[in-house]
């Protein structure tokens, strides 16, 4: 009873903080960056991280197993993974671009997970026999950590593409008036400065996208391999090509292609960012979209209206 009450308290606290953070982030986005608001949002993110950690711990105690058995629980763990990456980025103090991505991801994922939309899925039940294994923590946690890192890296690539293809403003190129000429040269100076800043920003986005996706790819690979071993123990086959396994393999292939393109200088930047952006969509199909189908060996993670 105490654990259940604590779980509800932590859920409401995390949802309240997330609601406040959304307001703060929107205020920072619509206006110039305000130092105090930014610091408040960062502290709020740290509090959210500890709240989600406490929520996972109370779930674990209350349910008797690590909370990764259905979509609702995995969404909470996904938001925790985003918050973990954000906390690491925050304490390194040189990855502001990554922090911006991870904070938004944490806010919206946790907000969705605790908003009540998934109320039907949040009803706790006894684990199905296939999930009553020590492999549950290793396989599912590594997969979701991999998804979180890959999603963050992909969003950095999406930002890179937006900045790259954004059209620059047109400047006066012909003017006999002294005032217009002066304005022209000033704008050329600003234009060159902006181009330099834009180039530096693109390079930084490309660098961090590569670093984060590389980390996520390692988690994804180990997660798939551990899942294959677990599948052999549970179902007698390492691979069954059910929808979740198939899309996980497609996700792995897409990001393997991304890492390959990063090895060639001619394909770095925009080309690799396009691949990562495709990967962003593939991950959501694998993680969320397949659950709408409710078919295959992983149907226990589906929406209640679609699983049999």
UniProtKB/Swiss-Prot annotation:
Keyword match Transmembrane helix: yes
Topology versus the membrane: Multi-pass membrane protein
Any one Gene Ontology cellular component term annotated for this protein: plasma membrane
Membrane-spanning ranges: 2-22, 44-64, 71-91, 143-163, 212-232, 239-259, 273-293
Disulfide cross-links: none
Localization annotation: Plastid membrane
Family per similarity comment: Belongs to the CcmF/CycK/Ccl1/NrfE/CcsA family.
Binding partners and assembly: May interact with Ccs1.
Name used for this protein in its record: Cytochrome c biogenesis protein CcsA
Gene symbol of the encoding locus: ccsA
